[in-house]
Curated annotation (Swiss-Prot):
Disease (UniProt): Retinitis pigmentosa 40: A retinal dystrophy belonging to the group of pigmentary retinopathies. Retinitis pigmentosa is characterized by retinal pigment deposits visible on fundus examination and primary loss of rod photoreceptor cells followed by secondary loss of cone photoreceptors. Patients typically have night vision blindness and loss of midperipheral visual field. As their condition progresses, they lose their far peripheral visual field and eventually central vision as well.
Positions annotated as propeptide: 852-854
Chief location bin: membrane
Cofactor notes: Binds 2 divalent metal cations per subunit. Site 1 may preferentially bind zinc ions, while site 2 has a preference for magnesium and/or manganese ions.
GO CC terms of this entry: photoreceptor disc membrane; photoreceptor outer segment membrane; plasma membrane
Outcome, altering residue 535 to N: In RP40; autosomal recessive
Lipid-modified sites (S-geranylgeranyl cysteine): 851
Domain annotation GAF: ranges: 71-220, 252-429
Native species: Homo sapiens
Membrane disposition: Lipid-anchor
Residues recorded with modification N-acetylserine: 2
Result for mutant: residue 854 to R: In RP40; autosomal recessive
Protein name: Rod cGMP-specific 3',5'-cyclic phosphodiesterase subunit beta
Length: 854
């Protein structure tokens, strides 16, 4: 059954909602276009009513674009394309408002947008901008008055400028322009030109224009506020980081400026910048004036600073941020150096003005280099230069910034940011009175940087070498419980007998560094402290691995030495029975101190640190390296993922840190001789006790005596290489000697000093003799007294004596060779003297193969 035309019309009149929905779907421009038989696009003018029907859809699309896109140009471009269709305008353009050198202007961002335009074709690159001052053109008038302007005929408009038409070969007839405001501030101007279906834009067009521009206004406001927020954030970061660096260097303006400018380079948003430092001398020295007074040279006639100083740049620091970062320091630069040749820095130093140059190549006042500056092909495009002024309002330097990274000219926000930086740096010049207070902090900074450079914490992959939870359980150690980790470690650790960690003759020569890490973990299990003090097993593994990485890869004082000291401490406690005097907590601290005692050792001794004026020597007055090792160990323990003390209570934690302080500082051999007599007194005192149990009970309660014994144990551990079997000790001795010789080389080349014989590789043949002297003077006492103290330690003393015999034999052999050489030289000298005497007494003269005496 079909409906008549009248019935259909009546139904639609009675059901307006259905009619609206039906025709909205069926009569969209796209469907109408598809229905065209000839395939031609529909006439936009005839579809004006349909466009209005589709207005809600268009607005929805714009809102979606605003949500999905963070690109301002892309969103505004879509708005302008839609406006071209709705207004029947030939094209639309976007002009962004900005300020340079205190002068406001409008620059094209999107130009000649048409309904079928592509964003890339309409987006104006920075070097092709059309710029209007506010006193030129209709767009400038709109920005000044902050009101919409509808120009029906540009020929009758006094504000119209044909400048853009001449550049683009276009004829503007009429236009509609409106400002985009953020409060009272102009953000941009949007303009539509040349009505296609009428002589000019109507009031209805103005309403549509404003309606759709609400979306553009909203997005441009967001963009503008985001830009201002970004600028303020950058400014805050610049001031924060420059303040950080300024207060690290308070004695030298050059280093102060360099550190600050280099640190904030990422926030300056430019490709290159240079800092010219001005000579602050107001009066010349007498010997410089004489040549002028004598008429031998002309007086200075160049520009001067506002306070009357001659403008002389004594140094230029050039920061290259494009391509490979580079810093070039040019002392006493010539006037034709590229950074000065334009005359801009001198002008800024003379006038104190901020100069913002949009197009350097076209500037008439300053002559910038037109071609590429270097092999990289870098060109000067735009420049921002400003003075650095101190609190006395003296210009101390000029900072010049080149080429904003996004290609646009520097704007008002860039000027504010750079001025904040230069102003702060200028004021900071007067802060040198705080140098003494900051000196120690400066040294700490240098040391912290050095620590970071050489220390890398155990990462997620490295821990799998010891705790392979991924392979075993398919998850990370952090996701495993302690029982699971314990089972894995039980299988992965070598056990106490594999490498003889209970033995005094232990040798690391057959072990890898990873084996030593595993042995270190095993020692904590053997001490029974893992379960007792609830050490997280993942933390224990990370700690040992990080300790091993904290040791530098040097000849002797490396991770192997650090582990050997800890293993000897473990052996003295367990095999040597010294554990009977100490609690589990104290043994825990002592083994840890052994592991940390030489961490980050540099291969040079304390005396070298002082001679070379190393920051460590300035930071620590005595036991320089030992205090640094202690601080490094504490630094690692302060990290939660490495803190094996994390489950100790406050009193326990204070106690272990106190013991570590004593144990590590005690490895300074300069202190060894101070404690020898006290240790010997304790050993003698132990012999007065017939009952060993009573002695153990007595000493266990004597805190001071226990600390003295512990300090001497650290010395015995540190020197324990001398007590190893000869085949091990002879190799280790060569490693020690090699490291000493390396220090001797440094003293000879860097310090220009003659090293002592022990560190002079030219006297390497004297090593056996030096070893015998070292054993007699330093080592014999400590191991002899420990063997008296506990007979279980006697093997160390016996091997020491055996090694002395070996070194003595080598020393005697060397002495015999030296003596034989000396005797031979003496015989030759006597023989030569005898021949000379015979000649003098009339004896036969020696025959010569080169001359004949007649």
């Amino acid at each position: 059954m079909s409906l008549s035309e009248e019935q259909a019309r009546s139904f639609l009149d009675q059901n307006p909602d259905f009619a609206r929905q039906y025709f909205g779907k069926k009569l969209s421009p796209e469907n109408v276009a598809a229905a065209c038989e000839d395939g031609c696009p529909p006439d936009c003018d005839s579809l004006r009513d349909l466009c209005q029907v589709e207005e809600s859809t268009a607005l929805l699309e714009l809102v979606q674009d605003m949500q999905e896109s963070i690109n301002m140009e892309r969103v505004v471009f879509k708005v302008l394309r839609r406006l071209c269709t709705l207004l029947q305008a030939d094209r639309c353009s976007l002009f962004m408002y900005r300020q340079r050198n205190g002068v406001a202007e409008l620059a094209t961002r999107l130009f000649s947008v048409q309904p079928d335009s592509v964003l890339e074709d309409c987006l104006v690159p920075p070097d092709s901008e059309i710029v209007f001052p506010l006193d030129i053109g209709v767009v400038g008038h709109v920005a000044q008055t902050k009101k919409m302007v509808n120009v029906e005929d540009v020929a009758e408009c006094p504000h119209f400028s044909s400048f853009a038409d001449e550049l683009t070969d276009y004829k503007t007839k009429n236009m509609l322009a409106t400002p985009i405001m953020n409060g009272k501030d102009v953000v941009a101007v949007i303009m539509a030109v040349n009505k296609l279906n009428g002589p000019f834009f109507t009031s209805e067009d103005e309403d549509v224009f404003l309606k759709y521009l609400n979306f553009a206004t909203l997005y441009l406001k967001i963009y503008h506020l985001s830009y201002l927020h970004n600028c303020e954030t950058r400014r805050g970061q610049v001031l924060l980081w420059s303040a950080n660096k300024v207060f690290e260097e308070l004695t030298d303006i050059e280093r102060q400026f360099h550190k600050a400018f280099y640190t904030v380079r990422a926030y300056l948003n430019c490709e290159r910048y240079s800092v010219g430092l001005l000579d602050m001398t107001k009066e010349k020295e007498f010997f410089d004036v004489w040549s002028v007074l004598m008429g031998e040279s002309q007086p200075y006639s160049g520009p001067r600073t506002p306070d009357g100083r001659e403008i002389v740049f004594y140094k230029v620091i050039d920061y290259v941020l494009h391509g490979k970062e580079e810093i070039k320091v040019i002392p006493t630069p010539s006037a034709d150096h590229w950074a000065l040749a334009s005359g801009l820095p001198s002008y800024v130093a003379e006038s104190g003005f901020i100069c913002n140059i949009m197009n350097a190549s076209a500037d008439e006042m300053f002559k910038f280099q037109e071609g590429a500056l270097d092999d990289s092909g870098w060109l000067i495009k735009n420049v921002l230069s400003m003075p650095i002024v101190n609190k006395k309002e003296e210009i101390v330097g000029v900072a010049t910034f080149y080429n904003r990274k996004d290609g646009k000219p520097f704007d008002e926000q860039d000027e504010v940011l750079m001025e904040s930086l230069t102003q702060f740096l200028g004021w900071s010049v007067m802060n040198t009175d705080t140098y003494d207070k900051m000196n120690k902090l400066e040294n700490r900074k240098d040391i912290a940087q050095d620590m970071v450079l050489y220390h890398v914490k155990c990462d997620r992959d490295e821990i799998q070498l010891i705790l392979p939870t991924r392979a075993r359980l398919g998850k990370e150690p952090a996701d495993c419980d302690e029982d699971e980790l314990g089972e894995i470690l039980k299988e992965e650790l070598p056990g106490p007998t594999t490498f003889d960690i209970y033995e005094f003759h232990f040798s690391d020569l057959e072990c890898t560094e990873l084996d030593l890490v595993k042995c270190g973990i095993q020692m904590y299990y053997e001490l029974g402290v893992v379960r007792k003090f609830q050490i997280p097993q993942e933390v224990l593994v990370r700690f040992l691995f990080s300790i091993s990485k904290g040791y530098r890869r040097i000849t002797y004082h490396n991770w192997r030495h650090g582990f050997n000291v800890a293993q000897t401490m473990f052996t003295l406690l367990m095999t040597g029975k010294l554990k009977s005097y100490y609690t589990d907590l104290e043994a825990f601290a002592m083994v840890t101190a052994g592991l940390c005692h030489d961490i980050d050792h540099r291969g040079t001794n304390n005396l070298y640190q002082m001679k070379s004026q190393n920051p460590l020597a300035k930071l620590h007055g005595s036991s320089i390296l030992e205090r640094h090792h202690l601080e490094f160990g504490k630094f690692l323990l302060s990290e939660e993922t490495l803190n094996i003390y994390q489950n100790l209570n406050r009193r326990q934690h204070e106690h272990v840190i106190h013991l570590m302080d004593i144990a590590i500082i005690a490895t300074d051999l300069a202190l060894y001789f101070k404690k020898r007599a006290m240790f010997q007194k304790i050993v003698d005192e132990s012999k007065n006790y017939q009952d060993k149990k009573s002695w153990v009970e007595y000493l266990s309660l004597e805190t001071t005596r226990k600390e003295i014994v512990m300090a001497m144990m650290m010395t015995a551990c540190d020197l324990s290489a001398i007590t190893k079997p000869w085949e091990v000790q002879s190799k280790v001795a060569l490693l020690v000697a090699a490291e000493f010789w390396e220090q001797g080389d440094l003293e000879r080349t860097v310090l220009d000093q003659q090293p002592i014989p022990m560190m002079d590789r030219n006297k390497a043949a004297e090593l056996p003799k030096l070893q015998v002297g070292f054993i007699d003077f330093v080592c014999t006492f400590v191991y002899k007294e420990f063997s008296r103290f506990h007979e279980e330690i006697l093997p160390m003393f016996d091997r020491l004596q055996n090694n002395r015999k070996e070194w003595k034999a080598l020393a005697d052999e060397y002495e015999a060779k030296v003596k034989a050489l000396e005797e031979k030289e003496e015989e030759e000298r006597v023989a030569a003297k005898k021949v000379g005497t015979e000649i003098c007494n009339g004896g036969p003269a020696p025959k010569s193969s080169t001359c004949c005496i007649l």
